[in-house]
From Swiss-Prot:
Its main location: cytoplasm. It comes from the Bacteria. It comes from Chlamydia felis (strain Fe/C-56) (Chlamydophila felis). The keyword Iron applies. It is an enzyme of class 2 (transferase). One of its GO terms (molecular function) is metal ion binding. This is Lipoyl synthase. Residues 63-280 form the Radical SAM core domain. The gene is lipA.
């Protein structure tokens, strides 16, 4: 009889195992009173953030700018993707009914003008957690009516009705990551499919044609340049307008190993490829889905304003 695979061991929060990095991936981490305030605000509410749970290398940078990405529906995922550090369980705890208000109170305390939510996959819930996310967004609209809201959602196992529930909540940006090129998807996220992700992105574009739709990929997993270019084309063809591209850094030795470190020049090249397809691309070694999300939205709006002024 085959033994069930052991659940992965999670590295201590805030610690990433040591791995020799190229020069362009070494950074000086800022700290100060703003970082301390952000940290204290989040700890006071007991909220989970993807910044901590996923061991994001940008946590110090973002918290020093008084920004954070809230992790909704708890801190335990019903999937176990090979790149991700978030805890796994087939039966996560029920969602906290007080979480929507806690997130709103935290966002108010941090005076967030652009609020970013992400979520653990909740395949154990009938709608994948879509209605619960919608509750959070409605609460945020009530408490911070002037703030924009960005949501990085799961694929809801292809449930379009669940997607519509989320989209009807009034978000500013809908984000769903394909994460990697099609060939590597079964290894990187075995409970998802590349085509299903494209389908959900396209369904969002069809349902709300004016909605800003975003997706992202990691590089350094062994993908070929031609595969990245094809992925960018696929995203453009399925209604995506914003794409993030960043270097994959494994959280521990238990995760998928890095195959290669992509140079800044290659990120610039991928950006130019995406822009030639009509995409707004934010690419760089430390770029993540929610990294500088407020600046990305602002720059996109500026670019759209410039285009609108061009005589036709």
């Amino acid at each position: 009889m085959n033994e069930a695979p052991a659940e992965k061991q999670k590295p201590q929060q805030g610690k990433r195992f040591s791995e020799r990095l190229p020069q362009w991936l070494r950074q000086v981490l800022p700290r100060g009173s703003v970082f301390t305030h952000t940290d204290a605000t989040l700890k006071r509410t007991g909220l989970a953030t993807v910044c901590e749970e996923a061991l994001c290398p940008n946590r110090t940078h973002c918290w020093s700018r008084k920004t954070a990405t809230y992790l909704a529906l708890g801190d335990t995922c019903s999937r176990r993707c090979g790149f991700c550090n978030i805890d796994f369980s087939k039966n996560p705890l029920p969602p906290d009914p007080e979480e929507p208000q806690k997130i709103a109170e935290s966002a108010k305390a941090l005076q967030l003008k652009h609020i970013v939510l992400t979520m653990v996959a909740r395949d154990d819930l009938e709608d994948g957690g879509a209605s619960y996310l919608a509750r959070i967004i409605h609460t945020l609209h009530q408490e911070l009516p002037e703030s924009t809201i960005e949501v990085l959602a799961s694929d809801f196992q292809g449930n379009v009705d669940a997607l519509h529930v989320l989209l009807d909540s009034g978000l500013t940006i809908y984000n769903h990551n394909v994460e990697t090129v099609e060939r590597l998807t079964p290894v990187v996220r075995h409970k998802a499919t590349y085509r299903r992700s494209l389908f959900m992105l396209e369904q969002a574009a069809v349902y709300l044609p004016n909605l800003k739709i975003k997706s992202g990929i990691m590089v350094g997993l062994g993908e070929q340049e031609s595969e990245v270019k094809q992925t960018l084309k696929d995203l453009a063809d399925h209604g995506v307008r914003i794409v993030t591209i960043g270097q994959y850094l494994r959280p521990s030795r238990l995760h998928i190993p890095v195959k290669n470190y992509v140079t800044p020049e290659t990120f610039d090249y991928y950006r130019s490829v995406g822009e030639s397809l009509g995409l707004f691309v934010y690419a760089g070694p430390f770029v993540r889905s929610s990294f500088n999300a407020d600046m990305v939205l602002h720059n996109l709006q500026d670019k759209q304003s410039e285009i609108a002024k061009v005589p036709r």
